[in-house]
Amino acid sequence: TKTKTFIYKEPSTEDLIKKKDIENDKTKSGINKSISLAEEIKKDIDELNKAILEKKKIGWEEKEKTKNILKKQKELEKQIKNTQKKNSENLKNKEKLNSSILEKQKKLEELMNKVFDEEMKKLLKEMEEMMDKADKEKLKDLLEKLDKENTDLEKELDRELE
């Protein structure tokens, strides 16, 4: 029986930038909501102060406005904490992402060093020399060696993808 082949696609730099931009936009949106709510609270406080100055006694209406301001203040606090939490998570994800990218880069570098080892470089140099000399049999032999090296390389890359 044959198993299904699954393809894992590493997100491209462009995808990562888009994701980061979306996260930044969400953070900015959260901050903007908090700013709007803070301005609304300030306006309500100013109105309440004005109402209190005009009246000798604090009535039911002023108490309701005070409750409303306190409610909005708690909502603002909740929004700010939520935005901070999301921002903190974004930073953690970026750190993980960066370490993941660094790890991938390191693996790729090791693979490239393995692939383009001295033997491969020697084969390529010999091939260049054979092109100048036009030695058909020697060139054929070098092409076979190069093909074998490339087959090994392909297998190594497949293993890296798994």
Language-model segments: which ranges?
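Feature detects intrinsically disordered, low-complexity acidic/polar segments
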Residues: 1-162
